[in-house]
Amino acid sequence: MSRPVPKPGILDIAPYTPGKSPVPEAGRKVFKLSANETPFGPSPHAIAAYKSAADHLEDYPEGTSRVLREAIGRAYGLDPDRIICGAGSDEILNLLAHTYLGPGDEAISSQHGFLVYPIATLANGATNVVAPEKDLTTDVDAILSKVTPNTKLVWLANPNNPTGTYIPFDEVKRLRAGLPSHVVLVLDAAYADYVSKNDYEIGIELVSTTDNTVLTHTFSKVHGLASLRIGWMFGPANIVDAVNRIRGPFNTSIPAQLAAVAAIQDTAHVDMSRVHTEKWRDRLTEEFTKLGLTVTPSVCNFVLMHFPTTAGKTAADADAFLTKRGLVLRALGNYKLPHALRMTIGTDEANELVIAALTEFMAKP
């Protein structure tokens, strides 16, 4: 008997594996430090706005997320008509791939880039082309060397997850200048709110002055609205028009829209998170380096640490040791970083516990 067969290439896609979600155990506190979630939660104003939506759950949302687009426009100085909102920036990444990629096309991503990129590429029948990195950092020349007449899209996470590295805005502009004009450059700025480097820019200037570059962002990270799945894209009118033609008519919920509007207006809550992140990013890097671990310099709300390959001291050993103590980090074998763990910057308590636990782990004979 025959059965339905997926399109060619679908079963070749490795499913996305999220960070572990710990199972609570009686008598033990568990800290989830595997998914880059904020330890502060959402703004209280966002929570209040979310609760207010409970009185209107029978209503369809406004289909274009107009109020949220206008709030984003005010916050960033953007034209709301050039903004699209989605169920997380993940949905928008998939919409872009669905709009611009098909069989015979190629999309380029960096060696340790976000795993949604190859999934979105392959799901649309296109070829995923990987550009090598330099010191776990996007290499513009490597990307440009991979361009062929079949290249239709380039994914650029800046800063990048899971490495925590970034490239200066001058390098982003050099990349755009080196790409053919028909290639869409996607600037994924999910972690932009945590970057304090003077040579970094989110990319608004580039999007505003070209017709082939888009910027995506999310409310899941610094705004703490990950469970609501809400994100956005700023792009040229031609790309916005094309993507809107296949976007679902009610793809963001009323609770998500209202919470996001309140979140983007609460700049004090965002600033608090930034200060906490910067303080602990420096401290954790220093402490882990003292233990003999190699820590990749990060500009995000997480740190990437590399472990020895010696039996008993590997990343897998450390992961098991920490998990038994209720400290859940992210193993990165699926990112081809089998000797590394990524730690979300958590509460003061969680961070201190990880330092103490890794100190004990590294001191073991």
From Swiss-Prot:
Q: Assembly and interactions? A: Homodimer.
SUPFAM superfamilies attached to this UniProt entry: PLP-dependent transferases
Read off the InterPro entries from this record.
Aminotransferase_I/II_large, HisP_aminotrans, HistidinolP_aminotransfase, PyrdxlP-dep_Trfase, PyrdxlP-dep_Trfase_major, PyrdxlP-dep_Trfase_small
Q: Which cofactor does it need?
A: pyridoxal 5'-phosphate
What the entry lists under Pfam families is as follows: Aminotran_1_2
Spans traversing the lipid bilayer: none
Sorted alphabetically, the keyword list is: Amino-acid biosynthesis, Aminotransferase, Histidine biosynthesis, Pyridoxal phosphate, Transferase
Q: Which family does it belong to?
A: Belongs to the class-II pyridoxal-phosphate-dependent aminotransferase family. Histidinol-phosphate aminotransferase subfamily.
Q: Does the keyword Transferase apply?
A: yes
Q: Which HAMAP family match?
A: HisC_aminotrans_2
Highest taxon, organism lineage = Bacteria
What is the protein named? Histidinol-phosphate aminotransferase
Q: Which organism is it from?
A: Rhodopseudomonas palustris (strain HaA2)
Tell me where in this chain the PTM N6-(pyridoxal phosphate)lysine is found. Answer: K221
Organism ancestry: Bacteria, Pseudomonadati, Pseudomonadota, Alphaproteobacteria, Hyphomicrobiales
UniProt pathway annotation: Amino-acid biosynthesis; L-histidine biosynthesis; L-histidine from 5-phospho-alpha-D-ribose 1-diphosphate: step 7/9
Catalysis: reaction(s): L-histidinol phosphate + 2-oxoglutarate = 3-(imidazol-4-yl)-2-oxopropyl phosphate + L-glutamate
Biological process (GO), any one: L-histidine biosynthetic process
Provide a Gene Ontology MF annotation, just one: pyridoxal phosphate binding
Query: Which EC numbers does the record give?
Result: 2.6.1.9
